[in-house]
Amino acid sequence: MRSIIADSKRLVVKVGSSLVTNDGKGLDHAAIGRWAAQIAALRAQGKEVVLVSSGAIAEGMQRLGWSKRPREIDELQAAAAVGQMGLAQVYESRFTEHDIRTAQILLTHADLADRERYLNARSTMLTLLRLGVVPIINENDTVVTDEIKFGDNDTLGALVANLIEGDALIILTDQSGLFTADPRKDPNATLVAEANAGAPELEAMAGGAGSSLGRGGMLTKILAAKRAAHSGANTVIASGRETDVLVRLAAGEAIGTQLIARTARMAARKQWMADHLQVRGHVVIDAGAVEKLTAGGKSLLPIGVIDVQGAFARGEVIACVGPDGREVARGLTNYSSAETKLIHRKPSGEIESVLGYMLEPELIHRDNLVLV
């Protein structure tokens, strides 16, 4: 089996905390130097590389003299602020040895949820790649809360892959890849060499927590691969402990688990909607509406809405949830939550009599709706 990385030109490489730190005692300068050398080798082959790197909080902990990762959000943010300085400095120093410029980009999920900021981030990253710069990306943990508490850089890597239409996402971890069961508990567990991204059985196989320094277990990596497939990006999950793992993957050697994007690439606008990690509200729709959306490719009409939850404005992305509580779609709503509460369960012909006006006959037009 040949590695999919060999034929991939634009790569997003995610490196976990345990691969750039000395077991929590600050940054491992030698390890970062090796990553810089490998990325320089890939660049020499004509590949474009965006690096998503963890390590800021771990570095901040070391600089502040903390031996355990704090639980309080304000302390995590303080550690991130202190550590981000060191992380950027070390990467810049190591890449300069290969005559490569770097750029620091700190993102939040809110940056990618806003359409204008999303497009600006995309334009900036593509310009940096065109200029031969290696963008080094991390979540802006200093100003966010939910991302520190629940987020992970695996997801961020997938979002970046979608943002720049990357060919592949490489998630480097301290594990060898995805196994059929937890190899620490089951001696019969075997490595999954290749599978389809988004295959339901993968989530059942994945489990277990990540290291104490990082936040992402194997499940987050599987879900990141599923998300990256939205833009047609394949994913490789491999051990960063393997010598020259990036160079060997680029040479075609099969290492770890590769997850292939089999689904059709989403249109850019629909991809942006699908990549919303948080939505302001959702509508519960009946079984008939679920069928029309999923099988018929129809628009969502107010009559198909059972309930309205959350507060949202016209033009925002909302989720569509079936009677069983499962999200089936999301899209840009033509009406606010207050308006939707007045017109739900009503035929489109009655919208004007209820509201005094009719903006659109659909709550969400099919052109602004994406299945999830």
Curated annotation (Swiss-Prot):
Which reaction(s) are listed as its catalytic activity?
A: L-glutamate + ATP = L-glutamyl 5-phosphate + ADP
State its location(s).
Cytoplasm
CDD domains per the record? AAK_G5K_ProB, PUA_G5K
Gene Ontology molecular function: any one: ATP binding
Gene Ontology biological-process entries: L-proline biosynthetic process
Full protein name: Glutamate 5-kinase
Pfam family name, one: AA_kinase
Q: Which residues bind substrate?
A: S54, D141, N153
> What PROSITE patterns does the entry give?
GLUTAMATE_5_KINASE, PUA
Question: Which UniProt keyword terms apply here?
Answer: Amino-acid biosynthesis, ATP-binding, Cytoplasm, Kinase, Nucleotide-binding, Proline biosynthesis, Transferase
Q: Give the CC-aspect GO terms.
A: cytosol
Q: Which InterPro entries match?
A: AceGlu_kinase-like_sf (IPR036393), Asp/Glu/Uridylate_kinase (IPR001048), G5K_ProB (IPR041739), Glu/AcGlu_kinase (IPR001057), Glu_5kinase (IPR011529), Glu_5kinase/COase_Synthase (IPR005715), Glutamate_5-kinase_CS (IPR019797), PUA (IPR002478)
Note the superkingdom of the native organism.
Bacteria
* Organism name: Burkholderia lata (strain ATCC 17760 / DSM 23089 / LMG 22485 / NCIMB 9086 / R18194 / 383)
Q: Which protein family is named in the record?
A: Belongs to the glutamate 5-kinase family.
- The chain positions of domain PUA read 280-358
